[in-house]
């Protein structure tokens, strides 16, 4: 006798309906065909033990079972239940007339109970597309599958309940009903962390707001204890809420990976994934013997946070380059190829040097220039080119923490972000696959973020002086477009520039002779200058762009070749009055001579004379005599 039952196989996000065919003839054997993996081949032993322990008998016959289509690879233990039901129906123990109306999936324990399986949500979507009357799943999976409307989902605890249901005794069974919209919307804004708890750090909040509004990638650089991780963990609270379609797509990925807890329905908040820096390439991007989604796919429509970025394996970081650009990941094997979506915001944090205190005014950095350079070289230029915004973060002094008022709540920031995203949704409504500024193509950048002549002039100067790549040029315009959307402007109009990052200024400082930079670094001397800057929206974007030079290649041979002219003629800086500058520098020299070797003061004075010669100070400025400061 030949009997057919129905189940489904999940490969990536694609689900294929599987016809389970069982034929019984005289004999004593069991054959399973259809390209199943080891778990599928072991199903015969689980089924036999489960039937025996529930008072049923495994048929003594020549059993041939086939999983069609036979050319498609089947993975997992979810075929236990449809195989067991088909075998019983072929033996005449249960009627087969209802098998064509229901799709079955579930793993059998040896005592006959049903265990949860992965990928039930996409299977439920497939069952509805196939116009099945219902879906029978393990009890632990019923809430997950019931979010699919117009499909009766029955959660069963054991195979005996399934047999009773298929025999027509369904008075004791009712489909699971979930109010999808109510459950989804009532949990959207239930956040445990809020930006109102953060005192100070307004510039970092601004950078996170711009990143959230445009979907831009971001990196935060600062010493230990400055609040990098704390700020990153609060980022989901200002992101725009998930739409139902985004939530369904995100929940499917987590269902396939087996990350949904029992009784969990739709994911209502954007995912926030924070893998440890020891993570492997396969765990990050996905794959394995039975390819599963990695962290980048689990962060789809959400945030992937890489804490202590340089501590990650360099080769592991390099595999992020293609997903960051294409927003999907393709896992290729000899016999099949699987594609998972990977549209996420990449947020990273890092220390500026191995000890963590380079540039910190309250601590002394003990790292040599070579150590700092090697530390920064762990992050490649192509990866940095894919990070739109960088932000320096410094610890908030205790007096500021104690006096500062509570910060702006996440709800207020989120409102501005939502308004900016709404403008972008309206702008790109006719363009499939593009929802925010970070997803713009090069053609769209020229259409929606083209600067005027003054803006082009500013960009040209930035490209030449900061040595930006073509990809960085496009990302400047994307960030500029986002800032304009936050301000409610359709055009990139003049605006007061935001405070440039100290490390952006270090790019200009890098143009000085190499030996001067090294001497300044050794004696701990800092230039004293006031930044006066006005520009366009894209001026703020230039300040935010991430490039190789941003991470301080101030000790490279390029700096020595460039000479001091580029730094001298910088359009971004102007020094304060000579009198104030000399007073501040003299104080630094005095302080330096007290904490370093005696020659430090002479080195600092030599630097002052060099700067006066380069016309950065008026010739009339008097320099202190080295002997007057002690030896």
What are these regions (language model features)?
Residues 533-534, 540-548, 553, 561-586, ...:
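Low-acidity, Ser/Thr- and Arg-rich intrinsically disordered low-complexity segments
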Residues 307-308:
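Walker B catalytic acidic pair
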Residues 171-210, 214, 245-296:
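P-loop NTPase nucleotide-binding/switch module
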Residues 39-44, 59, 66-76, 290-291, ...:
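Basic, amphipathic alpha-helical bundle interface domains used for macromolecular binding and assembly
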Residues 510-537, 560-566:
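Positively charged N-terminal leader segments that act as targeting/secretion signals
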Residues 220-259:
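Walker A/P-loop
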Residues 1-219, 223-226, 332, 472-473, ...:
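Peripheral, non-AAA+ core regions of ATP-driven protein-machinery
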């Amino acid at each position: 006798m030949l009997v057919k039952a129905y189940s489904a196989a999940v490969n990536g996000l694609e689900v294929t309906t599987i016809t389970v065919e069982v034929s019984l003839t005289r004999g004593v054997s069991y054959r399973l065909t259809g390209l199943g993996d080891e778990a599928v081949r072991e199903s015969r032993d689980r089924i036999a033990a489960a039937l025996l322990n529930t008072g049923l008998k495994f048929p003594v016959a020549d059993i041939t079972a086939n999983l069609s289509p036979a050319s498609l690879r089947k993975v997992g233990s979810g075929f236990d239940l449809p195989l067991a039901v088909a075998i019983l129906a072929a033996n005449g123990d249960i009627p087969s007339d209802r098998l064509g109306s229901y799709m079955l999936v579930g793993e059998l324990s040896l005592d006959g109970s049903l265990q949860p399986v992965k990928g039930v949500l996409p299977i439920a979507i497939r069952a509805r597309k196939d116009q099945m009357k219902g879906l029978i799943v393990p009890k632990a999976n019923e809430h997950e599958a019931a979010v699919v409307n117009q499909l009766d989902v029955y959660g069963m605890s054991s195979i005996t309940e399934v047999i009773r249901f298929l025999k027509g005794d369904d008075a004791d069974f009712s489909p699971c009903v979930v109010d999808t919209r109510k459950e989804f919307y009532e949990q959207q804004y239930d956040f445990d962390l809020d930006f109102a708890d953060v005192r100070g750090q307004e510039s970092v909040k601004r950078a996170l707001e711009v990143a959230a509004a445009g979907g831009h990638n971001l990196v935060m650089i600062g010493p230990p204890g400055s609040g990098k991780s704390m700020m990153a963990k609060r980022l989901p609270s200002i992101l725009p809420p998930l739409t139902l379609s985004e939530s369904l797509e995100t929940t499917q990925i987590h269902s396939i990976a087996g990350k949904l807890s029992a009784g969990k329905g739709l994911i209502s908040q954007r995912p926030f994934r924070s893998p440890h820096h020891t993570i492997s390439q396969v765990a990050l991007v996905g794959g394995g013997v039975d390819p599963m989604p990695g962290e980048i796919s689990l962060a789809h429509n959400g945030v992937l946070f890489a804490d202590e970025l340089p501590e990650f394996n360099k080769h592991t970081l390099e595999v992020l380059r293609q997903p960051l650009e294409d927003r999907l990941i393709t896992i290729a094997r000899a016999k099949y190829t699987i594609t998972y979506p990977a549209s996420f915001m990449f947020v990273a944090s890092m220390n500026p040097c191995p000890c963590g205190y380079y540039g910190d005014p309250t601590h002394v950095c003990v790292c040599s220039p070579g150590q700092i350079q090697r530390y920064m070289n762990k992050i490649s230029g192509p990866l940095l080119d894919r990070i739109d915004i960088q932000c320096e973060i410094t610890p908030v002094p205790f007096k500021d923490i104690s006096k500062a008022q509570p910060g702006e709540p996440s709800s207020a920031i989120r409102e501005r972000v939502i308004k900016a995203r709404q403008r972008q949704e309206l702008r790109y409504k006719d363009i499939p696959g593009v929802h925010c500024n970070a997803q713009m193509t090069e053609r769209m950048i020229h259409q929606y973020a083209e600067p005027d002549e003054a803006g082009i002039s500013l960009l040209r100067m930035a490209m030449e002086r900061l040595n930006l790549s073509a990809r960085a040029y496009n990302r400047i315009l994307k960030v500029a477009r986002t800032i304009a959307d936050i301000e409610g402007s359709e055009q990139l109009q003049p605006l007061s520039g935001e405070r440039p990052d100290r490390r952006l200024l270090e790019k200009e400082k890098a143009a000085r002779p190499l030996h001067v930079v090294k001497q300044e670094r050794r004696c701990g001397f800092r230039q004293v200058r006031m930044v006066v800057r006005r520009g366009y929206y894209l001026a703020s974007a230039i300040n935010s762009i991430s490039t190789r030079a941003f991470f301080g290649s101030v000790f490279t041979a390029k700096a020595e070749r460039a000479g001091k002219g580029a730094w001298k003629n910088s359009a971004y800086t102007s020094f304060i009055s000579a009198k104030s500058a000399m007073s501040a520098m003299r104080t630094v020299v005095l302080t330096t001579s007290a904490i370093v070797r005696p020659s430090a003061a002479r080195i600092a004075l030599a630097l002052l004379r060099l700067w006066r010669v380069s016309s950065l100070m008026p010739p009339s400025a008097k320099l202190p005599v080295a002997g007057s400061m002690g030896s």
